[in-house]
Amino acid sequence: MAQVELILLQRVEHLGQMGEVVKVKPGYARNFLLPQAKAVRATKQNRERFERERAHLEAQNLKRREEAERVAERVAGLTVTLIRQASDAGSLYGSVTSRDIADACGEASLGITRSQVLLVHPIKTLGLATVRVALHPEVLIDVVVNVARSPEEAEKQARGEAIMREESEYELETGEEVAEGPEQTA
């Protein structure tokens, strides 16, 4: 399959640094890099224009990076709390997505978009989770997400206390045996 040559206008993870000429599949160029203004086609005119504007683009990138580093210092160790409904076993009814985390960070005066939240898979259980947020392609911070059923429960989790009762504790309190799974009959 044919590949397209592009000049990167900014650092793109797993692809290259600003100014590099890279070859990518046409769909990746057409659907992501070109519309997001992360790259331009590597034509003769674009190469010449990029070389003329390189210093300006590098200065802009440096300014954005420094601003992101200042924000990262200000919010180091940020913890956001999300209150969700969950079963007694701790499974959420629904899940916490990158949009939920971005909204919670926005309330904490950290204006980020959901595309900046690097969440591999949605959070589906109560507890603490560490999520990476890309303030700039070169500046990543860790945000602790505290998912709980109530603000009181969130405080307990933040202190490191267990909120889920163990099955053995439940058995001691109630005298009932917790079922392991469906009984099998022969």
From Swiss-Prot:
Coiled coil feature spans = none
Which stretches does UniProt call biased (Acidic residues)? 168-180
Where do the segments described as Disordered lie? 151-186
- Does the keyword section mention Ribonucleoprotein? yes
Which InterPro entries does the UniProt entry name for this protein? Ribosomal_bL9, Ribosomal_bL9/RNase_H1_N, Ribosomal_bL9_bac/chp, Ribosomal_bL9_C, Ribosomal_bL9_C_sf, Ribosomal_bL9_N, Ribosomal_bL9_N_sf
Any one GO MF annotation of this record: structural constituent of ribosome
What GO terms fall under cellular component here? ribonucleoprotein complex; ribosome
Q: Name one Pfam family in it.
A: Ribosomal_L9_C
Thylakoid found in the keyword field: no
The UniProt entry's sequence similarity note says: Belongs to the bacterial ribosomal protein bL9 family.
Supply the PANTHER family for this chain: 50S RIBOSOMAL PROTEIN L9
What's the stated role of this polypeptide?
Answer: Binds to the 23S rRNA.
Q: Tell me what this protein is called.
A: Large ribosomal subunit protein bL9
